[in-house]
Amino acid sequence: PDVEAADVKLHWEPYQPNKFEVAQTSQAIVMYSGESKLNGKIAIGEAGMTGAGTLEFASAEVASKKFRFRKEDFKSDTASFAFTARDEVKNDGTKEVAIKTDNVKADVSFKNRQGQFKSNSADSYIEFPVNKYIAYMDELRWYMDKDEVDMNSSMNEIDLIGSRFVSTRPDQDSITF
């Protein structure tokens, strides 16, 4: 992808493959025509461009210790995803997280304008911090331009109970539906 970076730390070992690294210092690394900012680092080598850190979008964040970047997409075998409402800002200036999940395989396409996140573990869940619920589902699809998220559970085929939503509020005593 196209990358713009200022005030960065460079590390280059010309006789070693995969040893050209750019690490952000005070400003995020701007990527994908300004649609995302990486707080972290990138490395360029024979295998292409890789990176680590948190990619910020207008309404989402994807964090990983290892991204694989390509011209119109990026992937990660293990990532975290957080969906925020563009206009929902807390008193401290940070965005309110509506949906978040960890330990997912990420596949985000700027060409198709969507991201797909699949759970790496059968006991993973999706968290709704504002509503104080968690849901046992293993797939989430993010539509970038619509600010929408679809969730699915392929566990339904095995588990006849289906998707479960569980309250995390102490006064609701783990109410489930």
Mark where each language-model region is.
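Structural signature for solvent-exposed beta-strand/loop edge elements and short helix-capping sites
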Residues: 1-177
